[in-house]
Amino acid sequence: METIGFHYVVEAAGCDPEILGNADKIRQIFLEAAKVGKMEVKASYFFKFSPTGVSGVVIVAESHISIHTWPEKGYAALDVYTCGTTADPEKAVDYILDKIKAQYAHVSEIKRGIEEDDETFTHMILTWEEKLERKNGDEKS
């Protein structure tokens, strides 16, 4: 059984609130994450809420990367979905988590569009949690 795509659903906590509240910084991180994950960027849009929070999406040839942030809680909800075999969505997820300085991540990997013999599509979910070895004050490159 082959899969059509990989969808990473990520809960990130203990993130740097200053980064989560900065739409330009989040855009920069996401565009670089697309490169790191070997994705071809087609478009992007990021919106800064008042008084706080950012929502944004990068459309890539392989699908999309999106985020919704709650800086006051140090929390971000991420989606990274790719189709095909050239992209590396896990590298993009790791890059984003590092740059937003997440202390904790709960990641679900969903294999989307697994074709069964009777031409129905199912998906498989793999979930893991990580306590990340970084502190908000630490600068990692």
Curated annotation (Swiss-Prot):
GO cellular component, one term: cytosol
GO BP term (any one): spermidine biosynthetic process
Pfam family, one: AdoMet_dc
Record has Lyase as a keyword: yes
PTM: Is synthesized initially as an inactive proenzyme. Formation of the active enzyme involves a self-maturation process in which the active site pyruvoyl group is generated from an internal serine residue via an autocatalytic post-translational modification. Two non-identical subunits are generated from the proenzyme in this reaction, and the pyruvate is formed at the N-terminus of the alpha chain, which is derived from the carboxyl end of the proenzyme.
Metabolic or biological pathway: Amine and polyamine biosynthesis; S-adenosylmethioninamine biosynthesis; S-adenosylmethioninamine from S-adenosyl-L-methionine: step 1/1
EC number: 4.1.1.50
Enzyme class: lyase
Residues of the active site: S63 (schiff-base intermediate with substrate), H68 (proton acceptor), C83 (proton donor)
Reaction it catalyzes: S-adenosyl-L-methionine + H(+) = S-adenosyl 3-(methylsulfanyl)propylamine + CO2
Sites bearing Pyruvic acid (Ser), chain numbering: S63
Keywords from the named record: Autocatalytic cleavage, Decarboxylase, Lyase, Polyamine biosynthesis, Pyruvate, S-adenosyl-L-methionine, Schiff base, Spermidine biosynthesis, Zymogen
Chain positions of site Cleavage (non-hydrolytic): E62, S63
Cofactor comment text: Binds 1 pyruvoyl group covalently per subunit.
HAMAP family linked to this entry: AdoMetDC_1
Function: Catalyzes the decarboxylation of S-adenosylmethionine to S-adenosylmethioninamine (dcAdoMet), the propylamine donor required for the synthesis of the polyamines spermine and spermidine from the diamine putrescine.
Similarity field: Belongs to the prokaryotic AdoMetDC family. Type 1 subfamily.
Protein name per Swiss-Prot or TrEMBL: S-adenosylmethionine decarboxylase proenzyme
Record organism: Thermococcus onnurineus (strain NA1)
